[in-house]
Amino acid sequence: MPLKLTTYYHGKDIPELPGKNTFHSKELFLIYEATPGYTPLLIVATEDGRPVARLLAAIRKAKKWLPSSLVKHCVVYSEGEFLDESLSTNKEKAEEVFGDMLEHLTQEASRSCVLIEFRNLNNSMFGYRVFRTNDYFPVNWLRVRNSLHSMEKTEDRFSPSRMRQIKKGLKNGAKVEEAHTVEE
């Protein structure tokens, strides 16, 4: 039987679903729904009436000088949650299901968003082909965090390749800031 995709816009409409991933849960959907400036949407893939995967996206408004209709941003954490155990072992089928959900999300979110961003992908190569098919592109991002208990010779802790990456980043406009509080 073909895959059926259902999009939920309101928490009261979402049925109880199996799964343990907090980033694609009904609970997080309800939190986004109650938060001003956020509009969540949950895509659930079902096969033969049983849920096999889900993907939660949050559309947020940025409070900038531009009109809010121009600066809506859709964020998805990881590649979704696969509820069917057979998808965990069959990567090709998992990518096919993810590709269908990604295409559906792209159609839904591109109506109101300028940017759709996937963060914290578990495997950077998972779904690469379907991302490219849907006109997504990778962005190189380097975040370096180190505990600096002793301030002497901090550079000695970095490998030569990490030092090259940092120098290249600084040359290309990256900023280095020292954290003074826990919040930073």
Predicted regions and their residues:
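Amide-forming acyltransferase catalytic core, primarily the GNAT-like/NAT-type
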Residues: M1-E79
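Short, flexible loop/turn elements at secondary-structure junctions
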Residues: E47, I59, N120-N122, L148-S150, ...
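Sequence-level motif detector for i,i+2 pairs with an aromatic at +2
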Residues: Y38-P40, V52, C113, V139-R143, ...
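Acyltransferase donor/substrate-recognition loop-hinge adjacent to the catalytic core
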Residues: M1-Y9, V130-E184
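Hydrophobic, Leu/Ile/Phe/Ala-enriched alpha-helical segments that form helix-helix packing faces
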Residues: I14, P18, I31-Y32, M101-A109, ...
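Short, solvent-exposed polar/charged micro-motifs at secondary-structure junctions
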Residues: P15-E16, F126-R129, E184
